[in-house]
C-alpha cells in the first residue's frame, strides 16, 4: 500500500523534477551548477500558479477562522466536554463550515512536501554532482564545509538557507497570529536539521527556493497586478537567457543551442497575451459550448486526461509487451510480463491524479482552457503514435535502442510531423469551439473504452504466450550434467555459431590480441562469404541444414509450417551424427520450435545432450547485474522505462531523440545507465564457463554445436570499463568509424578472447589436434564501418547495407597448424554442414531427412538472399513461407565485395 501511495502521490512529482533537471542540464550542456539554478527558478515559476491558489485557500481559511474566533472562544469558555463538542458542531453547521477545512491552511506545506522529497531523492545521490565545483563550492556532492574553526568544519550554506527561510516566513506571516509564525519557524529549523550534512548541490537548490519564496512574499505584500507578475516573468526569462549565454561553454557553437532555447521560451512567454486575447475572442464569439457547463467541462477534461493516462500507461506498454512476450517473461523481477503493466499504469494514474488536482485549483476560465488543452494533447499523441511511428531499429527488453544514430529524423520528416500536428490541432480547436463540442464526452468516452479493449486483446495475447512458455519442457532434465563431451582419442567437431558475428573484426583482433593469435592456430578465414537473410530465423536453417534449407527452398515446401522446417534443419546434424554413434551436444539452439526462450522439445527424439547454457547461469548473471543501476526511488529498469517509452512514442519525431539522448541517461534520465544488459551477461557468462562444461571421454567421436549471442548484444564503452577492459575503448576508436561499430567491436573482441581461452584449454588437454573447429555467424550487421573498407563506398547506391550479408566464416581442420590464413573462395553459410562432414565416412555425408548428400544440393552459382525479413518467429508459427515480396530479394555471385556482382528486386544478374 505504501508503494502504491508513493507511486500515486510522490513519484509523479519526482518525474517532473527529474524532467526539469534534464531540461536544464540539456540547456546548459552539462553545467550542473547552472542547471540547479535553472531547476529552482523553473520549478518555482511553473508551480507559482499552484502556490498562489494554495495560499488563497490558506488565506480564506484564516479569514473564516478569524470570523468565527470570538464565538468559538465564548463557546469554549462556557461549555466543556461533550456539550462543547455538540455546540461547536452546531455552530459549524450554521456557518457551513467543517473542521476538515482547517487542512486548507496546510495546503502550501502539502505542496512542498512531495517537491522536497523528489528533490532530495534526486540531488542527494546525483552522480553529476561528484567532483563538480560551482561558485564557492569545491564539490557539489559533499557538504560545503566553507568555515573551519580549528578542527571543526561548519557548513555555512544550510545556515544561509535557514536565514533566508526565516526572512521569507517573517514577511509572509506579518500581522498573522503567533501560532502561524511559530509553525513556519519550526519548519525552517526542521529543514536545517535535515539538510545540514546534505550535499551542497541539494542545499543550494533549496536555498534558491527560499530566495524565490522571499522575493515572492515581498511582491505578494506589495499586491502586484497579474500584468506586473507577467512582466516580471518575462524579465526573469530574459535575464536567464543572458546568464545562460555567459555561463555555458564559451564557444559560439556550444552555446548557440541553449541560448536559442531560452530565447524561444522568452518569445513564447511574450506571445502569451496575444494567445490569451485570441482565446478570449473565441470564447466571446462562441459563448454557448459544452465548456460553459462545469460538470460537462470536467467530464471532457477527465475523460481526455484519463484516456491519455490509459493510453500511455496501459495501451502502449501492453502493445510493446505483446510484440514479444517471451522477452519480457522471467525478466527484471517479473515472472509474468503482465506485472510490468502495474508499474506503468500506477505511475500514469499518479500523473492523472496530479492533473486533476491542478484542474480543481484553478478558476472556471482556466479550467476551460485546460479541458480544451487535454483534448488537443490527446489528439497530438494519437497522431504521433499512429502516423509517425518511425523506424528506430532494434530495441532491448529494457527498452534501450541498440543503434542510437537511427533516432535522428530528417528535417523533411520532422516538418511533415509538425505540419500534421498543426493541422490536427486546428481541426480539433474548430470542433471544440463549435456546437460539435457537445459530442466530446461521447468521443473521449469511446476512445477510453477502445484503449481498454486494446489492452484486453494485448493481455490475452501476452498471457497465451506466457502459458506456452511455462509448458516448455527443455531436454536438460540433468541440468547439472556437463554440456559438452570431448574425446581424447577420437574425432571432435565443434561448430560455434556466433549470432551476428562480424567478419571485418578478425584482422584487428588478431593484430592486437596475443592470446587470440597464439590460440587460433591452423585457422582459415573465408572473407568472401555471404548469408541468406538479415535475421537469425531465416539464416540458421541453411547454416545447420545446408542448401536444402535456404529461404528460397524452404518457401518451395509451401504445405509445411515454417516452424517444422526450422526444427528439421536444426535437427539435421544432431540426428545424422547421433545415429552414427557420435556423442552429440547442441546448446542454445537458435529459435528452436520458434520460441525466444529455447524450447528443446524437438530434440527429445535424439540421443544427445541439449541444454540452455545461457539460462543455466542466469542466477549468476542476475547477481552480476543487480549491483548496478540503482537510484534513489528504487524505480529502475523496466519499472521506469516502460512509461517513459510510451512518452517517447507520444512525442514528435525529432523531440523523441532529444528526450531519449539529451540527458546523462536514457529517456530524460539524469543518472547514466550503469548496468550491462542481461542478454549480454547471460551469453558472455556462457562463454566464460565453456571449460567448466567439458566432460573428457577416452574414446568415441563427439559433435558439439555451440550457439552464443555475445556478438549479438553490443555494449557501451561504460560497460567495457565495468568489465575492466578499458583498453578496448581506444582500440575500437582506432579501427571503427562510428559508435555503433565500436560497440560491436567490443563484444566480438570479448567473444574471440574467450574462445581463445577455450582453445588453449583444448591444447593443454591434448584435444586440439583431433578437433575440427568451425566458427560461423548467421549474418553480419548493417552500419559496420571501419578503416580500410575501400570497397564500401562502391555500394553507396545499393539501397541497403551490404555489411549485413557478409557473415563470419572460419575453420580449423584436424591437425591444422600455423598462422591465420585467408581464403577468397566464394562461400555461403550453407557450406557449414559440408565443411563439418568433409572427409568423413560416406554415411555422414547424407541429410537423414531427405536422403540427399550435402554436396549434391550445393548451389551457389547465383545466391538468392533476402535483405528484409520479419524476424519475430513467435509471430510466424502458423506461417508456411517467408515474405514473397520480390523487392526483398537480392542476387550475388563470385565476389561479395564487387557491386557489379549484386542485383536487387526482380533483376537477376548472371
Please annotate each region the language model reported:
Residues 451-492, 502-527, 906-910:
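Membrane/wall-proximal cationic-aromatic binding patches
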Residues 279-344, 360-363, 367-371, 375-378, ...:
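Membrane-interface soluble catalytic domains
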Residues 37-41, 202-204, 486-507, 519, ...:
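Beta-strand elements within well-structured catalytic alpha/beta cores of enzymes
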Residues 354-355, 359-425, 490-491, 500-733, ...:
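Active-site-proximal alpha/beta segments of enzymes that process anionic O-linked groups
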Residues 524-528, 604, 763-770, 774-817:
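Histidine-centered active-site microenvironments of extracellular/periplasmic hydrolases
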Residues 1-290:
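Helix-loop-helix
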Residues 278-465:
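Transmembrane and membrane-interface helices of multi-pass
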Residues 440, 451, 474-489, 678-697, ...:
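A long, amphipathic alpha-helix that forms part
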Amino acid at each position: 500500500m505504501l508503494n502504491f501511495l508513493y507511486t500515486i502521490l510522490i513519484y509523479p512529482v519526482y518525474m517532473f523534477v527529474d524532467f526539469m533537471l534534464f531540461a536544464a542540464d540539456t540547456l546548459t550542456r552539462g553545467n550542473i551548477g547552472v542547471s540547479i539554478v535553472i531547476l529552482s527558478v523553473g520549478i518555482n515559476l511553473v508551480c507559482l500558479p499552484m502556490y498562489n491558489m494554495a495560499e488563497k485557500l490558506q488565506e480564506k481559511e484564516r479569514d473564516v477562522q478569524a470570523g468565527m474566533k470570538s464565538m468559538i472562544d465564548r463557546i469554549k469558555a462556557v461549555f466543556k466536554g461533550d456539550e462543547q463538542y455538540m455546540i461547536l458542531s452546531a455552530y459549524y453547521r450554521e456557518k457551513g463550515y467543517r473542521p476538515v477545512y482547517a487542512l486548507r491552511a496546510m495546503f502550501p506545506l502539502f505542496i512542498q512536501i512531495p517537491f522536497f522529497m523528489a528533490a532530495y531523492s534526486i540531488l542527494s545521490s546525483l552522480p553529476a554532482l561528484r567532483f563538480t565545483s560551482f561558485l564557492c563550492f569545491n564539490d557539489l556532492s559533499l557538504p560545503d564545509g566553507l568555515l573551519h574553526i580549528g578542527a571543526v568544519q561548519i557548513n555555512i550554506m544550510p545556515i544561509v538557507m535557514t536565514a533566508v527561510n526565516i526572512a521569507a516566513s517573517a514577511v509572509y506571516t506579518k500581522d498573522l497570529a503567533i501560532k502561524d509564525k511559530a509553525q513556519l519557524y519550526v519548519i525552517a529549523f526542521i529543514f536545517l536539521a535535515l539538510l545540514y550534512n546534505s550535499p551542497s548541490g541539494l542545499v543550494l537548490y533549496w536555498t534558491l527556493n527560499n530566495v524565490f519564496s522571499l522575493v515572492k512574499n515581498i511582491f505578494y505584500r506589495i499586491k502586484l497586478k497579474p500584468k506586473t507578475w507577467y512582466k516580471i516573468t518575462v524579465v526573469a526569462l530574459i535575464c536567464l537567457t543572458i546568464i545562460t549565454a555567459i555561463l555555458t561553454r564559451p564557444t559560439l557553437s556550444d552555446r548557440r543551442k541553449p541560448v536559442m532555447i531560452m530565447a524561444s521560451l522568452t518569445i513564447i512567454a511574450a506571445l502569451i497575451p496575444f494567445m490569451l486575447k485570441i482565446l478570449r475572442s473565441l470564447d466571446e464569439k462562441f459563448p454557448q459550448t459544452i465548456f460553459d457547463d462545469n460538470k460537462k467541462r470536467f467530464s471532457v477534461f477527465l475523460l481526455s486526461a484519463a484516456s491519455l493516462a490509459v493510453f500511455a500507461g496501459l495501451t502502449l506498454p501492453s502493445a510493446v509487451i505483446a510484440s514479444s512476450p517471451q522477452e519480457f517473461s522471467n525478466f527484471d523481477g517479473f515472472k509474468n510480463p503482465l506485472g510490468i503493466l502495474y508499474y506503468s499504469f500506477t505511475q500514469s494514474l499518479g500523473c492523472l491524479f496530479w492533473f486533476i488536482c491542478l484542474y480543481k485549483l484553478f478558476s472556471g476560465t482556466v479550467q476551460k482552457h485546460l479541458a480544451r488543452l487535454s483534448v488537443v494533447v490527446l489528439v497530438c499523441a494519437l497522431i504521433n503514435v499512429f502516423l509517425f511511428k518511425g523506424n528506430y531499429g532494434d530495441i532491448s527488453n529494457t527498452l534501450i535502442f541498440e543503434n542510437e544514430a537511427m533516432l535522428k529524423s530528417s528535417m523533411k520528416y520532422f516538418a511533415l510531423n509538425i505540419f500534421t500536428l498543426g493541422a490536427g490541432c486546428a481541426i480539433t480547436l474548430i470542433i471544440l469551439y463549435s456546437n460539435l463540442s457537445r459530442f466530446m464526452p461521447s468521443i473521449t468516452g469511446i476512445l477510453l473504452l477502445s484503449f481498454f479493449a486494446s489492452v484486453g486483446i494485448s493481455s490475452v495475447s501476452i498471457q497465451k504466450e506466457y502459458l506456452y512458455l511455462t509448458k516448455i519442457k527443455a531436454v536438460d532434465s540433468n541440468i547439472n550434467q556437463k554440456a559438452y563431451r570431448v574425446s581424447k582419442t577420437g574425432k571432435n567437431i565443434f561448430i560455434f555459431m556466433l549470432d551476428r558475428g562480424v567478419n571485418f573484426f578478425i584482422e584487428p583482433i588478431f593484430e592486437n590480441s596475443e592470446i587470440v593469435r597464439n590460440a587460433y592456430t591452423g585457422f582459415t578465414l573465408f572473407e568472401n562469404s555471404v548469408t541468406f537473410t538479415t535475421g537469425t530465423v531465416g539464416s540458421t536453417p541453411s547454416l545447420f541444414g545446408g542448401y536444402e534449407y535456404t529461404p528460397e527452398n524452404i518457401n518451395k515446401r509451401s504445405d509445411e509450417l515454417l516452424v517444422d522446417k526450422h526444427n528439421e534443419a536444426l535437427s539435421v546434424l544432431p540426428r545424422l551424427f547421433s545415429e552414427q554413434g557420435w556423442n552429440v551436444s547442441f546448446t542454445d539452439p537458435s529459435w528452436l520450435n520458434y520460441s525466444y526462450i529455447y524450447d528443446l522439445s524437438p530434440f527429445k527424439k535424439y540421443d544427445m545432450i541439449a541444454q540452455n547454457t545461457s539460462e543455466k547461469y542466469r542466477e549468476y548473471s542476475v547477481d552480476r547485474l543487480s549491483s548496478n543501476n540503482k537510484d534513489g526511488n528504487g524505480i529502475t529498469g523496466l519499472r521506469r522505462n516502460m512509461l517513459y517509452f510510451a512518452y517517447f512514442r507520444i512525442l514528435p519525431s525529432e523531440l523523441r531523440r532529444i528526450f531519449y539522448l539529451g540527458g546523462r541517461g536514457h529517456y530524460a534520465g539524469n543518472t547514466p545507465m550503469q548496468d550491462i544488459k542481461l542478454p549480454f551477461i547471460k551469453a558472455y557468462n556462457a562463454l566464460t564457463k565453456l571449460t567448466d562444461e567439458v566432460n573428457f571421454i577416452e574414446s568415441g567421436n563427439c559433435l558439439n554445436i555451440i550457439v552464443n549471442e555475445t556478438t549479438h548484444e553490443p555494449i557501451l564503452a561504460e560497460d567495457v570499463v565495468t568489465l575492466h577492459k578499458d583498453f578496448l575503448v581506444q582500440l575500437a576508436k582506432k579501427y571503427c568509424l562510428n559508435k555503433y561499430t565500436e560497440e560491436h567491436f567490443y563484444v566480438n573482441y570479448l567473444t574471440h578472447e574467450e574462445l581463445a581461452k577455450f582453445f588453449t584449454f583444448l591444447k593443454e588437454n591434448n584435444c586440439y589436434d583431433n578437433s575440427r573447429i568451425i566458427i560461423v555467424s548467421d549474418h553480419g550487421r548493417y552500419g559496420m564501418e571501419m578503416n580500410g573498407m575501400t570497397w564500401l563506398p562502391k555500394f553507396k547506391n545499393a539501397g541497403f547495407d551490404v555489411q549485413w550479408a557478409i557473415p563470419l566464416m572460419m575453420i580449423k581442420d584436424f591437425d591444422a597448424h600455423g598462422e591465420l590464413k585467408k581464403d577468397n573462395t566464394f562461400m555461403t553459410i550453407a557450406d557449414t554442414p559440408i565443411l563439418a562432414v568433409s572427409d568423413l565416412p560416406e554415411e555422414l555425408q547424407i541429410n537423414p531427412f531427405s536422403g540427399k548428400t550435402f554436396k549434391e544440393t550445393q548451389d551457389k552459382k547465383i545466391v538468392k538472399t533476402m535483405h528484409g525479413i520479419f524476424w519475430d518467429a513467435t509471430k510466424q508459427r502458423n506461417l508456411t513461407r517467408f515474405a514473397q515480396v520480390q523487392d526483398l530479394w537480392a542476387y550475388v555471385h563470385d565476389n561479395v565485395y564487387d557491386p557489379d556482382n549484386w542485383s536487387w528486386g526482380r533483376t537477376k544478374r548472371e
